[in-house]
Amino acid sequence: MIKSDELAKLVDTIEERFNKKITSNKAIYSLKNSTLHYYQFKEFGQTAVDIITNDNNLIDNIYALYLEPPLPSTVFPNRDVETFGSLQGDIEAWWSIYWHPFWGRLSLEKKKHYVEQKNLSNELKEFLLLHN
């Protein structure tokens, strides 16, 4: 899952690597010995992108973009942060699949910096730092 304003960076990186425009939500691209399976879809009302590739340089380039998923308050706008609780149901699925791979790679110091840089409620800051 990717923030909507970061999708263009991802697409540009892929298009540059494979010298082709992404024109649909599902695509397979090949260039020399590199192959990419690209699938863009909606989940939890947000854009998700599934990428399978054997191109290590592309993986490194995507990793260097420091893409991040949308915040829980964006994905679940009609829920009070206090109802997120112990990560059950759809919140647990979203957390495990989309948020934790991003959040888990940050040190505690970087997590603290992240929540301070965002315009988050105190409850959301506390929730994110609690689920370290």
Label every model-predicted segment:
Residues M1-N132:
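Polar/charged low-complexity regulatory segments
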